[in-house]
Amino acid sequence: MTGYQQAILYLSGTWSGGKYLVRNVDRWYVDAVSDLFPTAPYFQLRSDGPSKRDYWCIKSAHIAVPALDEVRDWQGFCRGFVELQGTLDLWSHKNRKGYTVRTLRLRIYGQPDALDAVANNLPAGRKKMQICRTQNGVTYLYAYQSPAEVSAIITYLDGFPRNERIWQRWNSFL
């Protein structure tokens, strides 16, 4: 199992009815772990409610749930984690002279133990973990706003396998 697959299982997986279930709105991630579920067909499920999106799902009773201390391929794990839980965008703010500028920003969301594990393996300085209140409760984030750090992180994460749609969008910012 690659680090990339471990990240997908860690973030998109859950135990349900005695089986480990992986679901995601992007079929790419279900396809990326499908070889770990050799006898399980995967399927598309319809979501309930007008604001929800349909999602892809695969499940099996014969899969081991990954733990953070079992990760050996940290580059792959971080790539999967940031693809699933990260946002790369342009941040509008004023510089010292008062002009509005747009700077590249990478925000990575998650729970404290996983965020710390990922942040410890990224080529960037230590950041203060921020609390982010959402409609689902509380989550945490690290925000990288230095263009040099963001570029170094994206360069470090670059590799395969990866979700090409996300990387095309990210490359449009670089």
Named regions from a protein language model:
Residues 1-174:
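Internal intein/HINT superfamily modules and their associated LAGLIDADG
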